[in-house]
Amino acid sequence: MNTYIATFFMHFGSIRYERLCKSKGYQARTMPVPRNLSSSCGTCVKYIASEPLFDRDHDEMETMVICNEDGSYTRIYKAEGL
């Protein structure tokens, strides 16, 4: 299992995504974006899963990173135009 953080352009996107994660049975929570990641709205969703979860309509998502064991992040998704 891996830990992922997804950031969003607006708060509603993070709330909606947290619900999606929980509906799939993943441990997920909305939280402030870590200082070394940026987000337009300041909230993100941190969740644990075997694979990243991409909603069919994920245009609300700004970025997604995987959390590495050493505390660093590896970006696995970035919205077009950023």
Predicted regions located by residue number:
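C-terminal structural segments of small proteins and small subunits
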Residues: 51-82
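Amphipathic, hydrophobic secondary-structure cores in small proteins
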Residues: 5, 11, 15, 20-22, ...
